[in-house]
Amino acid sequence: MTAEKSKALAAALAQIEKQFGKGSIMRMGDGEAAEDIQVVSTGSLGLDIALGVGGLPRGRVVEIYGPESSGKTTLTLQVIAELQKLGGTAAFIDAEHALDVQYAAKLGVNVPDLLISQPDTGEQALEITDALVRSGSIDMIVIDSVAALVPKAEIEGEMGDSLPGLQARLMSQALRKLTGTIKRTNCLVIFINQIRMKIGVMFGNPETTTGGNALKFYSSVRLDIRRIGSIKKNDEVIGNETRVKVVKNKVSPPFREAIFDILYGEGISRQGEIIDLGVQAKIVDKAGAWYSYNGEKIGQGKDNAREFLRENPEIAREIENRIRESLGVAAMPDGAGHDEAEAMDEEE
């Protein structure tokens, strides 16, 4: 750049900073602009790896959608539990009025410290979200769900009234207001969404999400969560096999998948993931039904191997860190994740 251009640019930058404040424009090489993405673990090792950065990015909007009973709320409660382990503060906007506090506690959520709101209208829910984000003291907000954000006009109207596009306009306006503040306050905002069917679609996917297209655009990460099978112990169903596809990712390559187990009353089975990913990475050996690590057998069948890792959290942590190292993901800090599971086992 010539001296004249450089001088003109410096004057323009000075004028912008004077008018809009320091930090309103900066070079990408500056420390503040080029800092690493801060993340919150999802509680699933496989999903953290699929996201490419080790978890959900802070200061961004995330959408999690899927069919009924696919594990959407369970996944977000696990993220809240992981955030609380780091000392963060979370809020849950329960627009569906269906949060099970006892189940949240079983998943490791520190319920007394969790902020909860059960708003009457969609406008109220989004105003509360806006106020919490602007406070700068909240690290994560979950809105459950977009489909339950009913506009005030719809609640006050008659049952058969047609009000097309009202919810989509509400979401579009709210996200326009929220996005900049979310980035500045480094708050992670998760919207849970439901699936609807488009009528008359002959070709392509007839599924769509509620609330219009604004959330699709403003989301940095979109996760499609599906139940793909049942987990049985003898003849009793004890959980679901779940697949999560990263359909949009602005912080890493998209379209990666993670498959993990969600056990009823326990949440995501981290030990089950460690076994599966350990076998894939050739860190855990599998011969027939037997699993072994470092030449020592850890269990016959996945259930027994899972139980062994639950009883030996040091070995589970060691295997997990080796898996993370082999895949280029940051190692887990000592005491995180497994101590919580150990404490839950002791309570039982």
Curated annotation (Swiss-Prot):
An individual GO BP term: DNA recombination
Annotated compartments: Cytoplasm
Single GO cellular component term: cytosol
Keywords: ATP-binding, Cytoplasm, DNA damage, DNA recombination, DNA repair, DNA-binding, Nucleotide-binding, SOS response
Similarity comment: Belongs to the RecA family.
SUPFAM superfamilies to which the protein is assigned, alphabetical: P-loop containing nucleoside triphosphate hydrolases, RecA protein, C-terminal domain
Keyword Transcription annotated: no
Disordered: annotated span: 327-348
Cited Pfam families: RecA, RecA_C
Functional note: Can catalyze the hydrolysis of ATP in the presence of single-stranded DNA, the ATP-dependent uptake of single-stranded DNA by duplex DNA, and the ATP-dependent hybridization of homologous single-stranded DNAs. It interacts with LexA causing its activation and leading to its autocatalytic cleavage.
InterPro entries (alphabetical): AAA+_ATPase, DNA_recomb/repair_RecA, DNA_recomb/repair_RecA_CS, P-loop_NTPase, RecA-like_C, RecA-like_N, RecA_ATP-bd, RecA_C_sf
List of residues binding ATP: G66, P67, E68, S69, S70, G71, K72, T73
Name listed for the protein in its UniProt record: Protein RecA
Chief location: cytoplasm
Molecular function terms from GO: ATP binding; ATP hydrolysis activity; ATP-dependent DNA damage sensor activity; damaged DNA binding; single-stranded DNA binding
